[in-house]
């Protein structure tokens, strides 16, 4: 977080997280293994060392292994492309000098690759905190405009602690001079 007296900037980490690297690698290795086992059962040539995949019948085991391997390789390709393109990264800039809030994110390649939202500070109604506990906890901060749009300000990934999210939301609300919603 970069803060001056009148300007506050939050960097947002995109898809280049350690967990994404881990899962993209694991899925790629698993997919390649399944694909090579299926191909070995068809060609009757051992393509994967330390296995006896030539003993498998191509129909139905080998073809299913090839299908699952291909699906996993495609999913892994998608994950690697989101990492390379750094989808979701960007920054939130709150500038009281010129009265603007800028939300900048990188998207998928194409005409809408760069997502840049600008709002005047006087058009902002509140800072909203949404906390949902359970199996998949959700702790997010939203910028709520006067026309009731809610723009997420927090990054995807590990949820922040309750103390962190309350502190950050309270600071933003005070910095922008708006009310804080969702904290009881």
From Swiss-Prot:
Keyword Membrane set for record: yes
Localization in the cell: Plastid, Chloroplast thylakoid membrane
Keyword annotations of the record: Chloroplast, Membrane, Photosynthesis, Plastid, Thylakoid, Transmembrane, Transmembrane helix
Disulfide bridges in this chain: none
Pfam families: Ycf4
Primary location recorded for the protein, binned into one broad class: plastid
Name by which UniProt lists this protein: Photosystem I assembly protein Ycf4
Domain of life assignment: Eukaryota
Species: Gracilaria tenuistipitata var. liui
Transmembrane segments: 21-41, 63-83
